[in-house]
């Protein structure tokens, strides 16, 4: 059968929160089958557990934030994206502050950590959410219109369009399509960094956001150009980072999707609305397992091979 996965060994790192600017220690621990991904705020007098669930998202300003009462875990999307890309179902995530560290602004460090810990299969079938009919969410009008859609597809594919009307971004591709039957998450998506604009920093920091942002963990632009001396990692790094985010946001459904995601100018808020809309329309999806690797769509066999 196509089995669930966790990591073999505990792994730990430290970093800063891109929004809080606070130092945080991150510990990733193996978890039993059917646990899912669970975040733990171990810095509090009593540890608070926050399961990685779309319905647990309480804030989507510049990040996906899990919330339980007054307790938050912010900026979960890059780690969730890495877990989705590597096919990891079960994991305990311990944090000593309210934000997952930003690392280099991509998912690459998390991919490295998870692979270093060793990825192992477990004696339990992996469950997938197979989309049976299209689900779409929209907001805005005209040039401000944003939308995101899930539609049936035997595998996992994403297509994304962006429109920032900025010379540095417009000089790159504003559209990308990734089908994991033929594309590699690790090689083609994981290294895409988050990005921001110098002229927005002051306003964001006054809102308690972007306090840990720097050229070390983001692509930063002035009015005309990219300020990072090393330039871009991919020719289409901007739109690929939006795909990276979407993969992480959608993995808050708790299981990998058998579907195609198509979006225009979507972000964390719309992605979360889409995930919730899918869960609410129960005739639009079904849970499936695969008796063997050979039965599963190529998208899941292509990169989830264990050494």
Swiss-Prot record:
It holds the Pfam family LpxC. It catalyses: a UDP-3-O-[(3R)-3-hydroxyacyl]-N-acetyl-alpha-D-glucosamine + H2O = a UDP-3-O-[(3R)-3-hydroxyacyl]-alpha-D-glucosamine + acetate. GO terms for molecular function: metal ion binding; UDP-3-O-acyl-N-acetylglucosamine deacetylase activity. Keywords: Hydrolase, Lipid A biosynthesis, Lipid biosynthesis, Lipid metabolism, Metal-binding, Zinc. Its cofactor is Zn(2+). The keyword Transit peptide does not apply. Pathway: Glycolipid biosynthesis; lipid IV(A) biosynthesis; lipid IV(A) from (3R)-3-hydroxytetradecanoyl-[acyl-carrier-protein] and UDP-N-acetyl-alpha-D-glucosamine: step 2/6. It comes from the Bacteria. This is UDP-3-O-acyl-N-acetylglucosamine deacetylase.
